[in-house]
């Protein structure tokens, strides 16, 4: 037993010594290749996810996008929390409009919208004059989408759309938006992992989906408040012409009844308050 113990101790000392020597000469133990690390990572998810991931890589290659290097990037991950977020969205939790308003802090936003409008009044007025969209409605959109530009999401849109696809959540949306996202990044020379989004992949203060960024975003800076305000007005103007009303344009922004009522009511409150203060 003593001899066995001494042998084990000697092996351990040799291994420690080897690690010390490598550190001393500035060498680190060899890291696994990207392919090997990818296998390790994907082994942590269900086999069905690996299948979906492989089919997605093949599909995207056919569309002209080689996403192998993105999948192998250490910043890539399949985000399990996205499933929970979709299941617990405010639209699913709210039983009526009053509850929806409580979830989105309507009473606080009645005050915050006035502060936002005062801070961005010149650009809101320009957008209203150019596109014919009331400045209060534009401001209300920012209120519900990004709490008046206080946040733009903590997720990565590439991870979000890939996660949605492999987990079977709104796959009909995920793949087209993933393609639009990669088009946007290619066109603007942006590293996709530098972007932040909501859990549903909506980007910046206006919370545009990638397809909307490509069609309706005006300007060069995703995080310019002026560019975001102009782009929201541009979007609403287009869809008001198609739908025939401002309410229908807001519905195109988010096709949920509670969302539309929240935006329209908040805009009306702001308009009434501003009219009374003049």
Range-by-range predicted roles:
Residues 197-208:
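Extracytoplasmic ligand-binding site segments that recognize negatively charged/polar headgroups
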Residues 1-172, 180-190, 195, 211-278:
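Cell-wall glycan-active module
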Residues 177:
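A contiguous pocket-lining binding segment that forms or flanks enzyme active sites
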């Amino acid at each position: 037993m003593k001899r066995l113990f001494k042998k084990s101790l000697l092996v351990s000392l040799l291994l420690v010594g080897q690690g010390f020597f490598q550190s001393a000469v500035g060498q680190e133990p060899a890291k696994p290749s990207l392919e090997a690390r990818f296998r390790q990572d994907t082994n942590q998810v269900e086999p069905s996810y690996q299948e979906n991931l492989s089919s997605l890589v093949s599909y995207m290659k056919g569309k002209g996008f080689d996403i192998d290097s993105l999948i192998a990037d250490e910043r890539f991950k399949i985000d399990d929390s996205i499933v929970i977020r979709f299941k617990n969205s405010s639209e699913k939790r709210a039983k009526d409009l009053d509850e929806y308003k409580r979830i989105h802090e309507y009473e606080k936003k009645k005050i915050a919208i006035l502060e936002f409008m005062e801070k961005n009044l010149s650009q809101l007025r320009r957008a209203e004059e150019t596109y014919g969209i009331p400045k209060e409605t534009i401001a209300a959109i920012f209120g519900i989408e990004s709490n008046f530009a206080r946040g733009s999401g903590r997720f990565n849109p590439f991870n979000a759309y890939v996660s949605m696809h492999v987990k079977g959540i709104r796959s009909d949306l995920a793949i087209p938006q993933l393609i639009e996202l990669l088009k946007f990044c290619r066109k603007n020379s942006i590293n996709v992992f530098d972007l932040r989004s909501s859990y549903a992949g909506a980007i910046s203060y206006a919370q545009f989906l990638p397809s909307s960024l490509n069609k309706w975003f005006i300007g060069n800076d995703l995080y310019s408040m002026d560019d975001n305000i102009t782009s929201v007005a541009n979007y609403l103007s287009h869809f008001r012409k198609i739908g025939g009303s401002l309410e229908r344009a807001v519905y195109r922004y988010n096709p949920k009844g509670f969302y539309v009522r929240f935006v329209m009511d908040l805009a009306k409150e702001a308009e009434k308050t501003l009219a009374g203060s003049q």
